[in-house]
Structure formats: structure tokens, C-alpha cells
Amino acid sequence: MGNVPTKLEEPQNPSSRLKSSSFSNSVSGNSDITDSPGSGNGRSSSQTKLNNARSKKKNASLSNGLLKSTTISSRKKDQLDREQFKEDHAAELLVKYYESVDGGFLAPFGCYSLEKLNYNPKIVKKLIIERKLAPFYTPLQDFNDNWTDEELIKIIDGLPLHASFNESLEEFEDIPTGDLKSKDFDYLIDSSSLSKREQKKLHSKIFKARLHKKRIAWQEMENTYFLEKKLSNKNILSKSKDSSEDMNNHISNSSNDILNNIDISLPNDDLKLSLYQSGIECPICFLYYPKNLNYSKCCQQPICTECFVQIKRALPHFPHDDNEHNNEDDSEKDPHLLISEPANCPYCATPNFTISYSPIASRKTGINGVKQFYYKPPKANDDANLSNNTAKPVYLTSDTIRPDWEDKLNKERSRLQRRAANATAIHVSNQLISPGRSENNEIPSNLKELENQMIEQAIKLSLQDRKQNESGSRKKSSK
């Protein structure tokens, strides 16, 4: 046995040392052998403990590095997902001339900035296609009842598909954008001279600038396509010297070269006149639209769809009490008291603003209707010219197009709960390390009290999270 320690110290391989350590411990019958002078087993045990400590430290370092790498990778993925969501949202707001309903479109003209168009575009498009919400009409800057039909058609033909963009916004000045076709733009950020916070801030600015340029490029492509088709239709009709009414008589002739080259997604002159001969002003944006807009349920005031999608609930806040004169900080209030009030009518301030829309049955063109080029105006005594008033009216609110308002409210409540928990932890920590404790007999009781506070806070947060999870599960199962 005298040669055993010498053999245990020779291997440089950590695994060999671990095996030798196991052998030594099994021989001794105790893993915690006390070192003693002249004891070979003592030296072996010390070396084994040192090797084990080094191995544990190395494994811990590797685990921490892997965990940190996984966390960074997860954050990067979340960031990419958020950016992709914003790009997809912007793409849903493109106006496409062939996506038309009753003479209007599925996307806004562009009276408001992208930041204000934070409604759910898929829901809005579905409502427009189902004729429950007025389409996004192209507005007129002015309207005159004395315009002749020729003058009105000329004005309508000159309308763009989308409002012009401000290509040189001040907030994006001197912000590099790089190659817009490439998803990666981290090479534009100098990581050697900027702090992590500055890098994150610059990344956000670059993404916004890139998205702004992408929106311009995407919409310009649609605008160009629209103008080309509109010019092509005009040239074909002028060469044939046929009116749109004569052209409709040739529909049954499939061999007609003129019809084969006409884009029937574009409106004919009859539809243009039907839409804009009786223009009406939206009291909010002061632009003129076809008369059959949305109307408020409370005071029967018109409102265009582009203005309606701007109206939303107030941000989560604590109830206002006029009789309350204290200056209590919001962080000290119960997060469950947070509320998100429905929007009021912009005209008469009636709570829970609601609108209704009555489509004109004879003007059912575009998606799920007659092609716009084939539209025929109804006769004077045609019942189809009347609005579809026999149907039960459908009422919509801002919650209809923003169904995630409750999720946002719960997120804000959770944020305040975490903030309160952090404040409690800091307060407890400060009490633990605060100087000036002269009476030692107070320390145990204070520590116990603080420990109880922390346990109560942890239980409270756990119960709140459980309630939220159960509520979310019930909603998903009900859907």
C-alpha cells in the first residue's frame, strides 16, 4: 500500500484522477480522510479534493457560459420575431388596387403615420369584405356640387392610390440603412465604441429607418402597377371609341381582343360617378368621401374608416378620484386596480363609442361582388339602389379591431407587480444591511419579520400568476 499515493499523483488526465480518488476512498472507507504527517492517504485525499474542486469549477463555468449563450440566443430570436411582426404588419397596410370592395380598398390611404395604425389589419379587412365596415375610400381634398361629370371623372382619375410619403424624415437623418434586401444590419453598428445600451438604441433607430424605406418602396411598386394598368385601360378605351356601357355589351364575346386586354378590377366611369357625385365630409379629417360612410350609433355623425381605426381605449391607468387629494405614488397602489376605459364618442363624448355601416346593395363590387369594370348604375325605380336597411345593423367598437386590449392591461398589471416586488426586495435588503444596529437581540426578530414579508410577497405573486394562467387557459378553451 505504500506505493499507492505515488501512482495516484502520476496521471495528468482529470478522469484518471477521479477514478483513482474513488479507489482510494473505497479503500479507506471514508471520502473525507484527514491529512496527517507521513500519511499517504491524506495527501491523496487532498489532491483528489483539489482536482474535484477544479473540475466542478470548470463544469460550472461551462454551464454558465452555455446558459448565457442560450439566453442571448433566445433574446436575439425574440427581437427578430418582433421585427418580423412589425414588417408583416406594415405589409398588411399596403393599398393594392385589385383588393377593392364597393369602390374602396382594404388598406388606408395614408392620412396618418404608421405608429397610429396599430389596429389588427386582418380583422379590419375581414369586416370590410363582409360589408360590416366601410372600405378605405380614396378621399378628395375638396368637393363642389357644381362640378360636371367630366370634371369629376377627371379629378378622380388623377387621384393616387396612396398618399405621398415624407422620404426625408428628421428622425431618420444620418441613420444608416444598408442593403434593404438583407435582413442582417448589425454590421452598421460599431460595437467597439458604443455601449450595449447605445447599440440597442441605434439598432432600434436603424430598424425603423429601414422599415420606413421599405414601406415607401413597397407602396411605390403598387402605385406604379396601378398607374400602368389605369393608363393601359384608358388607351384601349380611347382607341376603341367605345364607352364603358358599350363595352359591357361585348362581355359575352370572349374573343374580343379589347376585353382580353382590359383590367376589369379598375372601376368604370359609372362607378366613379356613383361614388363621388354626392360627397360628404368627415368631421375629423375634413376630407371628402362617398356618402355611405360609417355612422356613430349615439349621434349619427359620419366617420371615415381611416379615422375610426385611430380611436382606441385609453392606456391602462388607475381610476381618477376627484375627492382624493393625497399624492400616493402609483407604485404603491394595487396593480389590480388598473383599468382601461372604452373610448368615448369624438363628437358627443358618449362612453363606449360604437359605429354602424349600411352598404348599398346595388354597389356591391370588387371582392365577393361584380367586377368594378362591369358595374351598371341602377334604374331610378330599382329597389336595389336602396341601402341594405332590412338587414339587422352590425355595431362595431374599437375593441372589435383591437381585441388584445385585455392582454395589454394584464401585462401592465404584471409589470407593476414585478416592480412592487423589486421595490420590496430592495427595501428588505436595505433593512438587512442598514447600519446603527446596537441591540443584538433585535436582529433575530427583525430578520424573521423580513423573511415573513418576503415569503408573503412571493406567495402573493405566485397566486396572481396562477390566476392569470387559469384565466388565459379558459379563454383559449372557450375559443
Swiss-Prot record:
The subcellular localization recorded is: Cytoplasm
Asked if the Swiss-Prot or TrEMBL record annotates the protein with the keyword Transferase, the reply is no
Q: Which protein are we looking at? A: Protein SIP5
Instruction: Give the protein's biological function.
Output: May negatively regulate the SNF1 kinase.
What is the organism lineage in this UniProt record?
Eukaryota, Fungi, Dikarya, Ascomycota, Saccharomycotina
By sequence similarity, the record places it as follows: Belongs to the SIP5 family.
Composition bias type Polar residues, residue spans: 32-53
* Signal peptide, first to last residue: none
InterPro entries of this UniProt entry? Sip5/DA2
Q: Where is the composition biased (Low complexity)?
A: 13-31
List the keywords (alphabetical). Answer: Cytoplasm
Region feature (Disordered): 1-62
Q: Which GO terms describe its cellular component?
A: cytoplasm
- Tell me which domain of life the UniProt entry assigns to the organism this sequence originates from: Eukaryota
Species of origin reads Vanderwaltozyma polyspora (strain ATCC 22028 / DSM 70294 / BCRC 21397 / CBS 2163 / NBRC 10782 / NRRL Y-8283 / UCD 57-17) (Kluyveromyces polysporus)
